Structures are given as C-alpha cells and as structure tokens.
Amino acid sequence: TITPQPQSGNSKPRVFRLSDDKAIINSLGFNNKGIKKVKKNLIKHQKSYLNNKIVGVNIGKNKNSSEAIDDYLIGLEELGDLASYITINISSPNTEGLRDLQLRGKIEKLIKKIIDKRDEIKNINTKPILIKISPDLNEDQLRDIALISLANNIDGLILTNSTIKRETNLISMNKGKKGGLSGRPLYNNSNIILKKMYELTNGQIPLIGV
C-alpha cells in the first residue's frame, strides 16, 4: 500500500510465521517509499508493464496524517493514470484509526470524494475503484458498506484484509504476536464475509476474495 509520504512502518520484527497453523501475523504499517518514488518507478517501466498486463495500485494514508481523505485523493491523482485499477485500503489493522474509515459516515464521505475526484480527471475517469475491507466487520457494517458501494457505483470490493481476532485453537509459538492474522485460520470467516457481501449487493458488484 502506497502513502503520499514515505514511511518506515512499524518497528521490527513485524512479520511472524505461524507454521503449525499455516498462517502469518504481520504488523508492517504501510512501509513504503512514498508516492513520488513509486510514480517515478511506474513511469520508468510503463512501456514494459503496460503491455497486456494488469497493474493494481493500493493507496492508503500516512500514519501521522490528520487528513486521511486528502491522502487518498493525492494517491488517486498521482497514480491513477499509471494503474489499471485503484484499491482504497481502509482495512489494515496496523495503522491506528485506519479501520474507523469503514464506519458508515466516514466511508460514505470518503467514497463520494474519491468517485468525484476520479470522474473529474480526464485520464483516470474510467479507472475502476475497489475498496478493501476487514473481516472483523459485523453484519450491520457490511450492510452499510454494501449500500454505500451500490449507491456510488463502486467497481469492486476486495474481501478481506487480515484479522485482529484470534482463534482459540491456534498452536504456534507466535500466536500472541500483535498484528493482522492471515492464512488458513482466516479462510472460513473470509468466505463467510464473501457470501454475505454477495447477498447484500445482490451480486451487482464484483467481489475479489483474497
């Protein structure tokens, strides 16, 4: 996930393998080189990677940003014309306060501004916008996101990011580490979210299971 300014992410160690559970816990925290560097790299390799290839760009907010929406708008403006699609990552558990952007009032405001900005920029007004959501949302929250996505013609939903929940049957030594859990323990719940969201959107929005 790319943020406007470069940031180092959370302190190391921040990736833990749970081999016995076929899982990983990460607390990376959007470590990246920032939009300027990424844009430069994309332009440099534009001819080679755009040759019949799909290039997705995930955008997020900086850890210390006071204006989250502005960070996403900057990402869209700067990288939109270099991507095949843009993913709005509002579901990582490793940036404090980020997942609050999934709450009804906040996500509605964010999505409207993102769509308005995309539609007004000639080079990116046809680029698909996808939203990546958490597996830890309750049914009311999923319903809100479904309705808001339908109302604003969101092009797709990515289901799901990693979870902060821990199954009681985890047996690996690193099971208590802080961060987002992904892998086999998340498989069933992620598929449940996928099924629920298909029902809530009446199959009208493409869903990507990860």
Please give the residue ranges for each predicted region:
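Metal-dependent enolase-superfamily TIM-barrel catalytic cores that perform enediolate-based chemistry
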Residues: D71-E120, S134
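Conserved, mostly hydrophobic/aromatic
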Residues: V38, V57, I88-N89, K132, ...
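Active-site beta-loop-alpha junctions enriched in small/polar residues
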Residues: I2-T3, G60-N64, S91-P93, K132-D136, ...
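Non-cysteine beta-strand/loop elements that form the S-adenosyl-L-methionine
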Residues: T1-N10, G80-S91, D155-T163
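Short beta-strand/loop segments at the ligand-binding rim of alpha/beta enzyme cores
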Residues: L50-I59, E120-L137, E199-G209
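Glycine/Thr-rich beta-alpha phosphate-binding loop at enzyme active sites
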Residues: P93-K106, L142, I148-I205
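Active-site glycine- and acidic-residue-rich loops that bind
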Residues: K61-I74, D100, K106, L130-A151
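A gly/proline- and charged-residue-enriched helix-loop-helix capping module
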Residues: T3-N51
